[in-house]
């Protein structure tokens, strides 16, 4: 692969600035970071120093790491090293803590330990739940054979005056897929897969001037009313 040297230098400079800005915002909002490793898997804890009363004060995460073949060892109680494995399955549980004095780590480890180490079975169960939600409705405005074309081709063929119908249908499906994937105990805050960053300008909070409403807009029209409970209850 050949890369233009000037373009690469400019790209590196821009990326370095973005990293510095991201790191500064991250340190302002995230503290007391505690990674951990043991033979069973990985753990993580952090605090949110700018948490509002009644909001999320801490975060805890546990990852059960199941490896087949090879060797594994723990280094410095922070790193799990796996070498020569035929397969590695990672089961993750992440919990936001509203009460900083009520940890969930033991509960997460127990729930992860009870899961079968069967990727195909876990995926099938997951796909069944998401598939039932996703297939409750379908938008058909005549996209037809254009669904066989790539998104890039559809974007090129679409104009403001004459938008491609298959592109509209795909965008509608993408919005429903995203909200299904991002909704849990809480609705998404337009970070991560929505905004391309974990430190957006609105501090990753639940901004009501359009961010959260835009994310959950597909719930009712997509016939997924139970997903609204993450926002209303």
Predicted features by range, described:
Residues 1-233:
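Aromatic-residue-lined binding/catalytic grooves and analogous aromatic/hydrophobic interfacial grooves
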């Amino acid at each position: 692969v050949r890369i233009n040297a000037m373009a690469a230098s400019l790209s590196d400079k821009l990326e370095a600035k973005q990293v510095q800005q991201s790191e500064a915002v991250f340190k302002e909002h995230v503290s007391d970071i505690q990674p951990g490793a043991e033979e069973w898997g990985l753990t993580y804890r952090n605090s949110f120093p700018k948490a509002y009363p009644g909001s999320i004060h801490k975060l805890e995460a546990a990852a059960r790491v199941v490896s087949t073949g090879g060797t594994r060892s723990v280094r410095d109680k922070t790193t799990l090293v796996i070498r020569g494995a035929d397969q590695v399955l990672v089961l993750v549980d992440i919990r936001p803590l509203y009460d900083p004095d009520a940890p969930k780590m033991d509960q997460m480890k127990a729930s992860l330990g009870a899961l079968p180490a069967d990727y195909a079975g876990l995926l099938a169960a997951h796909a069944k739940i998401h598939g039932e939600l996703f297939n409750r409705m379908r938008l058909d405005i005549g996209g037809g054979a254009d669904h066989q074309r790539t998104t890039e081709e559809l974007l090129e063929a679409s104009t403001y005056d004459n938008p491609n119908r298959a592109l509209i249908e795909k965008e509608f499906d993408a919005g429903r897929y995203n909200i299904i994937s991002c909704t849990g105990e809480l609705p998404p805050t337009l970070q991560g897969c929505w905004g391309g960053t974990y430190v957006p300008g609105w501090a990753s909070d639940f901004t009501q001037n359009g961010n959260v409403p835009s994310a959950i807009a597909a719930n009712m029209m997509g016939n997924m009313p139970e997903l609204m409970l993450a926002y209303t209850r």
